[in-house]
């Protein structure tokens, strides 16, 4: 059995097995998590300069910012097997 990767936009992929949660960046607690990750060097910005629409928390305490909607990332995680399509 191979490692399953999820496309989070613009050709960026993350390991599906290591995702803890996928959330919207709008709430104050999530903004604090993003700032803490930035200060500790564990923030990965995969937005390519676009608006952050999803925040992905990994089991390694890394925080990944994506410009893809959280629902889209979740659908890619639990939905289709074709994970290389851009959405």
UniProtKB/Swiss-Prot annotation:
A Pfam family per the record: RemA-like
Family: Belongs to the RemA family.
Protein name: Putative regulatory protein GWCH70_1057
């Amino acid at each position: 059995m191979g490692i399953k990767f999820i496309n989070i936009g613009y050709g960026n992929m993350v390991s599906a097995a290591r995702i803890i949660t996928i959330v919207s960046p709008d709430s104050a607690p999530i903004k604090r998590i993003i700032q803490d990750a930035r200060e500790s060097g564990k923030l990965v910005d995969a937005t390519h300069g676009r608006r952050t629409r999803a925040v992905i928390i990994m089991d390694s305490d890394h925080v990944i910012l994506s410009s893809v909607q959280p629902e889209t990332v979740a659908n890619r995680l639990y939905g289709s097997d074709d994970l290389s399509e851009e959405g």
